[in-house]
């Protein structure tokens, strides 16, 4: 199969090779070589004609130019190479570092309390939204959307009054929108089901298992390359009601399951053939970012993984569960809704709220197809300014933290360093950079901020000329436990605000592939570190090769030709992806108030911290709740 397309794919890294950055700071002199006014904000990159990041393909997410300055700051050699710091002369009521949902929500909450406050929001990426990015494609003359990061409105627990209130203020009613716009049963109405792709490198031969209704697991696996014993054990684990822990109460079983991995449960409790492990290994990737070796059995029980149906476990959360499993096992989770661009629409609605002239439209439905005017995001006359391509490199209280009345923030943009000032600062960036931005923090707080290691992941979005092969094979999504990407699925079908998803297999379609580059056998935080290194050292060409190879092998029996049927690729790489959630297998059970995320988010003078890391929960409601807390601490 050809590695390259018959026609070249449009892909480009925005201003490849040009250092891009974030930031702002106060008049003063806390950074080397501070000089007079030097920032021509109206001549900035984001004001250039045709500037529109959502439509870019190639490497997105943490794109080239978004992280290099922060890495130099981490490595201790930024300031020695930075040159003079230029004073912008700008002073604000609030500077927010990070234009993700948490940062934008912080700006929103601040203006709720302080009317016409002047706010500067800085972000190191070329687009706002943080992880809540969107990818736009024009296919067959029609706009097609897909999430580049945060997938949907969803949480293990009901949204708080604060988070729910923000959604309602923005005009988002998830329940009503879900009923009106989200066609969840569309693919099943066509007879499409889940598939499982067994790759030859892991299972000795390429084979697609279709999980068809009305068939047993023995029937589904009969022609697969799995050994007869592995087939029999998978069928037993999926279907049999066996108590593998006889003589124990439900609570006793739960306590034991909380301290063993699902892998150990399968091998040592259910006594499954070792070949079964590979079949289930990646099933936890999408939720936890690591395999079944690093996720407790009690965690996956909450997600109805097989093997527990005969244990007679009482419903409900249990001690020892992480935030995700405990939430779903207890409250059952929040309402859910998927915008066509994931939660990027929430970020766009927040920007409309803060800078109305930049985002046309009037409601939560029409924002989906709206085209942002990026040139209006950073205007001197606007009370709220959003400055992209600007990497914060310093945030310090002016004077002693206990008595400080203002803050200085420094940032790098276009190879220069600038400073601006404010009465307060919210750091809505990732926890791991904060000790380097605020070197004056107490050492114990710095250590707490460094504790969590964000989960790395890849969302690769691929444009297809049509999706006939999926229809021919009878699948809408495919789990691939041994492959480079652990899943591939057709885009969700959502019709909203004049935007309509494709319906015919003959029409162009977007599909998403997910990769979590974990390293089985290591503790989760070490797996995350290894995965971060893997992602940042993988070229677009390598991602593209694996996309073409894997889709070709899965879909070729349905008539798919990777060389001609793939028309565009966008790879969203997130080396610092999901917020770290404490893992019962590896992390202690801290007393109330002593967990690293709680210690790490403490206010420091006129600087407060807001992000999903601060909540130790990789969900949008956590990002919103932490933004509200940070603003309350500074108000």
Mark where each language-model region is:
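N-terminal Rossmann-like FAD-binding beta1-loop-alpha1 element of flavoenzymes
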Residues: 93-120
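N-terminal secretory signal peptides
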Residues: 1-10, 37-39
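Glycine-rich active-site loop/strand segments that organize a redox cofactor
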Residues: 47-48, 52-55, 130-161, 305-328
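Conserved flavin/dinucleotide-binding core of flavoenzymes
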Residues: 44-83, 136, 200-202, 412, ...
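Active-site/ligand-binding neighborhood in enzyme catalytic cores
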Residues: 238-390, 401
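Glycine-rich FAD pyrophosphate-binding loop
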Residues: 111-135
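Mid-domain catalytic core of redox enzymes
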Residues: 380, 384, 388-512, 516, ...
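Dinucleotide-binding Rossmann-like beta1-alpha1 core, especially the glycine-rich loop
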Residues: 140-231
């Amino acid at each position: 199969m050809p590695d390259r397309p018959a026609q070249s794919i449009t892909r480009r890294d925005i201003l490849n090779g040009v250092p891009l950055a974030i930031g702002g700071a106060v008049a003063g002199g806390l950074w080397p070589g501070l000089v007079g006014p030097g920032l021509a904000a109206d001549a900035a990159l984001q004001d250039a004609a045709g500037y529109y990041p959502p439509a870019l393909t190639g490497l997105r997410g943490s794109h080239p130019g978004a992280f290099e300055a922060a890495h130099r700051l981490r490595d201790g050699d930024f300031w020695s190479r930075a040159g003079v710091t230029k004073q912008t002369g700008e002073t604000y009521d609030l500077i927010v570092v990070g234009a993700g949902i948490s940062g934008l929500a912080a700006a929103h909450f601040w203006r709720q309390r302080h009317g016409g406050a002047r706010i500067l929001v800085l972000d190191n990426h070329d687009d706002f939204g943080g992880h809540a990015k969107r990818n736009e494609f024009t296919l067959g003359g029609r706009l097609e959307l897909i999430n580049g990061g945060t997938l949907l409105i969803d949480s293990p627990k009901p949204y708080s009054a604060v988070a729910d209130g923000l959604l309602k203020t923005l005009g988002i009613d998830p329940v009503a929108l879900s009923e009106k716009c989200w066609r969840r049963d569309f693919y099943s109405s066509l007879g499409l089901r889940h598939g499982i792709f067994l790759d030859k490198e892991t299972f000795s031969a390429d084979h697609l298992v279709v999980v068809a209704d009305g068939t047993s697991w023995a029937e589904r696996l009969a022609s697969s390359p799995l050994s007869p014993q592995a087939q029999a054990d998978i069928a037993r684990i999926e279907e049999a009601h066996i108590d593998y822990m006889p003589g124990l109460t439900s609570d006793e079983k739960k306590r034991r399951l909380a301290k063993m991995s699902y892998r150990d449960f399968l091998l040592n409790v259910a006594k499954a053939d070792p070949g079964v492990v590979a079949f289930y290994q990646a099933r936890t990737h999408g939720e936890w970012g690591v395999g079944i070796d690093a996720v407790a059995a009690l965690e996956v029980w909450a997600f109805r993984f097989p093997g527990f149906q005969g244990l007679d476990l009482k419903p409900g959360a249990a001690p020892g569960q992480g935030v995700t499993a405990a939430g779903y096992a207890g409250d059952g989770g929040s309402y859910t809704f998927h915008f066509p661009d994931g939660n990027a629409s929430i970020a766009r609605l927040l920007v409309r709220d803060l800078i109305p002239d930049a985002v046309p439209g009037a409601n939560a439905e029409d924002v989906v197809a709206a085209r942002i005017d990026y040139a209006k995001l950073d205007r001197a006359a606007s009370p709220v300014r959003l400055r992209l391509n600007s990497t914060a490199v310093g945030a310090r209280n002016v004077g002693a933290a206990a008595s400080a009345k203002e803050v200085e923030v420094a940032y790098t943009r276009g190879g220069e360093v600038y400073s601006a000032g404010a009465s307060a600062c919210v750091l809505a960036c990732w926890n791991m950079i904060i000790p380097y931005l605020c070197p004056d923090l107490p050492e114990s707080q710095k250590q707490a901020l460094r504790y969590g290691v964000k989960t790395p992941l890849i969302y690769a979005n691929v444009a297809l000329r049509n999706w006939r092969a999926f229809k021919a094979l009878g699948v809408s999504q495919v789990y691939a436990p041994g492959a480079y990407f652990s899943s591939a699925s057709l885009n969700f079908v959502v019709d909203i605000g004049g935007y309509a998803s494709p319906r015919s297999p003959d029409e162009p379609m977007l599909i998403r592939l997910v990769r979590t580059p974990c390293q089985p056998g290591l503790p989760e935080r070490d797996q995350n570190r290894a995965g971060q290194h893997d992602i940042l050292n993988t070229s677009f060409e390598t991602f593209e090769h694996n996309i073409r190879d894997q889709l070709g092998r899965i879909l070729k029996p349905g008539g798919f030709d990777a060389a001609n049927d793939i028309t565009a690729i966008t790879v969203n790489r997130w080396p610092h992806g999901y917020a770290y959630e404490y893992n019962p297998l590896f992390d202690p059970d801290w007393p109330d108030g002593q967990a690293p995320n709680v210690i790490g988010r403490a206010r420091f003078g006129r600087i407060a911290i807001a992000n999903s890391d601060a909540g130790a929960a990789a969900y949008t409601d956590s990002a919103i709740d932490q933004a509200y807390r940070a603003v309350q601490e500074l108000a």
